[in-house]
């Protein structure tokens, strides 16, 4: 039987809001919201006779209220854990603003009783343009300084009096201002030179030749200068040895130490060196048989889902039961080589809950060292002068230079004719020696293309016998007759009957192995 699900009851506040208007609220809800329970009544009636306010009871602060703990028979209490109040003298603030300008000559205001007609003066009179002193009268109105009376508050009570003393002459604050004017006639020119050196704001001294100077020391000495070779010269330069690091800064982080401890810990991680080149290019083909996917990236962590109960033989025995193979990690060995490492996880056992248990394996392979190539002297491509040989096949015959003037006018016609017997068998003989050391032996009909087999040349005094098998046609083999011994195969026979005569009679008994075996029957 299924157990009924317990529904959550609404809060007291929600019930009070819904039932107060209709007047159907339970008494406990009304007393709870309106604070009319038994505990509330005890607090109300008890607070009439006893007052504990301001003591901070049951607040958890431990400060004794706003007045602190007061020992018996002593003065005011001390607040626990609070810093003492520091009384500082008050400083009269000053108003920061523009300074007061003192007028040089103020304009006299117009008197209301003065006439409204202004008398004009004759401007045709000659103005005084001669230089002279201009008298300036400045009226300074002193600022009245009254004695400032400071009212000190009067504090009365049973406690000690605390006086707030204020300095009558506060310290005067000085203000320093700086004004900068822009001069349009002055122009600053900043320029930089491409020369290598250091320039300081000190004065530079320039020495010019021909201005007449005094020679100090011996006569001048001519020094032969050498020209520095540029990088565009055609000289062969020795290659610079490769640098191990570009910046001598060692940055060792906690992650690197943890990773190195996980890879090279022989107690927790199995070390396996892989020599197959597929480990760098496509390591998944070493774990299981599959097709190549050109879209998949082998540089990420690979997870192989398989059934532990199923027996699957991987292409490489070192990757047996591999469930997870991490991404490649490039490190440097002590010999200076680059090592490619991958951290794998085996799934050798499986529990009933589905958890798989296996050891961690560190697969690594070292990349071979790439030696620096030897420098090769290069030649310029272009026209150059030199001897060249041109061979033409039609003119490979021998050419004789014969002087025509030395030929006699009459030729001797009495030339003995060579008698040749064309019926002789010597003409059929071929004196040429054939060499079949680089020949090819073709077996089969010539109407179709067949693979060619090259017969190598052996430096041996013995006769060379080459056996060639033709798998496309019929092969007839005529073996030599040899006398072979006749092999008599044993015929199968039953068990031998063993007789053991005990008397002179012909009685016998069967061997225990020949007796019929009794079948065991199961009785219910």
UniProtKB/Swiss-Prot annotation:
Entry keywords, A to Z: Capsid protein, Cytoplasmic inwards viral transport, Disulfide bond, DNA-binding, Host endosome, Host Golgi apparatus, Host nucleus, Host-virus interaction, Late protein, Microtubular inwards viral transport, Phosphoprotein, Viral penetration into host nucleus, Virion, Virus entry into host cell
An annotated Gene Ontology molecular function: structural molecule activity
GO cellular-component term (any): viral capsid
Post-translational note: Highly phosphorylated.
Domain of life of the organism encoding this protein: Viruses
Location of this chain's protein in the cell: Virion; Host nucleus; Host early endosome; Host Golgi apparatus
GO biological process: microtubule-dependent intracellular transport of viral material towards nucleus; symbiont entry into host cell; viral penetration into host nucleus
Pfam families: Late_protein_L2
SUBUNIT field: Interacts with major capsid protein L1. Interacts with E2; this interaction inhibits E2 transcriptional activity but not the DNA replication function E2. Interacts with host GADD45GIP1. Interacts with host HSPA8; this interaction is required for L2 nuclear translocation. Interacts with host importins KPNB2 and KPNB3. Forms a complex with importin alpha2-beta1 heterodimers via interaction with the importin alpha2 adapter. Interacts with host DYNLT1; this interaction is essential for virus intracellular transport during entry.
Cited function: Minor protein of the capsid that localizes along the inner surface of the virion, within the central cavities beneath the L1 pentamers. Plays a role in capsid stabilization through interaction with the major capsid protein L1. Once the virion enters the host cell, L2 escorts the genomic DNA into the nucleus by promoting escape from the endosomal compartments and traffic through the host Golgi network.
Similarity comment: family membership: Belongs to the papillomaviridae L2 protein family.
Name recorded for this polypeptide: Minor capsid protein L2
Species assigned in the record: Human papillomavirus 22
């Amino acid at each position: 039987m299924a157990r009924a699900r317990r529904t959550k009851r609404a809060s007291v506040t929600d019930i009070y809001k819904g039932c107060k208007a209709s007047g159907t609220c339970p008494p406990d809800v009304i007393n709870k919201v309106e604070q009319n329970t038994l505990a509330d009544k005890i607090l109300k009636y008890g607070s009439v006779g006893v007052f504990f306010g301001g003591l901070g009871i049951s607040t958890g602060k431990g400060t004794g209220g706003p007045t602190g703990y007061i020992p018996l028979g002593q003065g005011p209490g001390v607040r626990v854990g609070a810093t003492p109040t520091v009384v500082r003298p008050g400083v009269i603030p000053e108003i920061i603003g523009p300074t007061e300008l003192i007028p040089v000559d103020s304009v006299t205001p117009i008197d209301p009783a003065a006439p409204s007609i202004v008398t004009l003066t004759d401007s045709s009179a000659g103005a005084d343009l001669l230089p002279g002193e201009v008298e300036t009268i400045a009226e300074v109105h002193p600022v009245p300084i009254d004695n400032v009376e400071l009212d000190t508050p009067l504090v009365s009570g049973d406690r000690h009096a605390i006086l707030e003393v204020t300095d009558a002459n506060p310290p005067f604050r000085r203000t320093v201002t700086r004004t900068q004017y822009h001069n349009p006639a002055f122009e600053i020119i900043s320029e930089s030179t491409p020369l290598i050196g250091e320039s300081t704001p000190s004065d530079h001294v320039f020495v010019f030749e021909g201005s007449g100077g005094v020679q100090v020391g011996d006569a001048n000495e001519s020094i032969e200068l050498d020209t520095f070779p540029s990088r565009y010269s055609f000289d062969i330069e020795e290659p610079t040895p490769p640098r191990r690091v570009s910046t001598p800064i060692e940055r060792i982080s906690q992650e690197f130490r943890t990773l190195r401890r996980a890879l090279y810990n022989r107690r927790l991680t199995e070390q396996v060196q892989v020599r197959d080149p597929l480990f760098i290019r496509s390591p998944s083909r070493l774990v299981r048989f599959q097709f190549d996917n050109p879209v998949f990236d082998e540089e990420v962590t690979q997870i192989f889902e398989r059934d532990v109960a199923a027996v699957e033989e991987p292409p490489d025995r070192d990757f047996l039961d591999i469930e997870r193979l991490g991404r490649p990690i490039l490190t440097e060995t002590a010999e200076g080589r680059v090592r490619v490492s991958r951290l794998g996880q085996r799934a050798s056992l499986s529990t009933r809950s589905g958890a798989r248990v296996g050891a961690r394996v560190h697969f690594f392979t070292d990349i071979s060292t790439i030696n620096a190539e030897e420098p090769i002297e290069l030649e310029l491509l272009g026209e150059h002068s030199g001897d060249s040989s041109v061979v033409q096949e039609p003119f490979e015959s021998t050419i004789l230079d014969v002087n025509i003037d030395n030929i006699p006018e009459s030729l001797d016609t009495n030339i003995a004719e060579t008698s040749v017997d064309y019926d002789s068998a010597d003409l059929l003989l071929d004196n040429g020696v054939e060499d079949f050391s680089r020949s090819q032996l073709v077996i089969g009909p010539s109407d179709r293309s067949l693979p060619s087999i090259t017969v190598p040349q052996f430096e041996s005094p013995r006769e060379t016998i080459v056996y060639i098998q033709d798998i496309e046609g019929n092969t007839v083999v005529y073996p030599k007759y040899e006398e072979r011994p006749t092999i008599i195969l044993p015929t199968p026979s039953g068990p031998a009957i063993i007789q053991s005569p005990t008397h002179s009679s012909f009685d016998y008994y069967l061997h225990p192995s020949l007796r019929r075996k009794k079948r065991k029957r199961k009785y219910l």
